[in-house]
């Protein structure tokens, strides 16, 4: 799955995202709404990671979620 597909299938993968990044709240995930950039921003905010680290995690998440 790529970043574009994440948005289209967000309802399917939202639970997986919350399992992976437990510090993300339901409100955070509502704001993200499948947007990879928003997800990276929330990971950066909640976990104190650099933008690059957060984007790498999102990319890895997208690649491990087989559609």
Region annotations inferred by a language model:
Residues 1-67:
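Intrinsically disordered, low-complexity, hydrophilic segments
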